[in-house]
């Protein structure tokens, strides 16, 4: 027997190669590719062969019986019936580290700024991590965003999630740029989701600038990207922000916009045959939004913070839009920008009477809270008689509080207005509020 074994060893017989499971493409319908013959799980990445021999990256988004539904990351061109479908052999995680600071990536974590490859000593999951709600650190410290109206009247805490809600052309992106430049934070993660290509470059060069970019990571998925890439880019910026938070740093996440993330989810869900519900949004959209938002916030114990600000587009200035309504319910506050204030040249066009910060009372002093309430009350009293003043129908002396509100109104307007390049630190903003309402 030993002689036979020696003879077999001398022949150097190798095991046959393991066959790679291969499927084939059977249909293309809109955004969906249909594949059979290869067992793939949901969320798995795969490659589809094109007519010229190149490969198109896609992801499994569903299945029915023996048919697997794929959605490509890029535009699906050059596909033919019977094309090979192979499971992706690359890693589903990404290496991240300090080298990511000042870089711009897409929804797959690939650099798009032409400055070479990215790497690091930690593994970044493409899915935002979940934190046990009982272990999340509470919101206890104010976050200085450099905007007087927010610092004084709608104070945001470190670890809070807030929405900037407004119609188109009211100044959401401009205000977001001001917050980006002036917020006191260690790291800023910016997600530009569904934006016009022109606005992406303008935001990076003008709003962020060279100094702001040094402490920022920008995730880009413009409007011409596939809906799957827009969804993945939104989740990617949350994963990046959570990574730096868990390293003990104070992180500000800016996502522009949550509405376009919901629209991308709608495109994916409708392609899979999910029935439309409220204004064409399938039910799964409103179950995915809370999962995304809850991945933001503070981490466990005494680790760093992750504050998040989302822009929310109110279609037709409708504050009862389903995405706006859902965001208002799941966020820790909302800042409403109105077209009326914008048309009057009031920048930022923040309507403090319609806005609220749910964490403000626990991060500021009682004196600060009282002064903010007095200013809101003065705005409300002035609003009741605003139409009477130009007509000469308002008669002073009937109500001393209303008289004081009318007298204070020009000073309140001046206090709440701010130039796009003007910095308004937290302490001077609060001192100005207290002095005006004393």
Question: At which residue positions do the language-model features occur?
Answer:
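P-loop NTPase catalytic core
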Residues: 152-153, 159-438
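Active-site phosphate-binding and catalytic loops of NTP-dependent enzymes
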Residues: 14, 54-57, 92-96, 111-117, ...
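Flexible glycine-/small-residue-rich
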Residues: 27-29, 37, 50-52, 62, ...
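A generic structural signal for well-ordered coil/turn residues at beta-strand boundaries
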Residues: 21, 29, 42, 100, ...
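Phosphate-interacting basic helix/loop segments used at nucleotide- and nucleic-acid interfaces
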Residues: 7-11, 88, 145-150, 237, ...
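N-terminal accessory targeting/assembly segments
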Residues: 1-103, 108-112
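Detector for glycine-centered tight turns/loop "hinges" at secondary-structure junctions
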Residues: 53, 109-116, 121, 318, ...
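P-loop NTPase nucleotide-binding/switch module
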Residues: 83-85, 92, 112-160, 173-178, ...
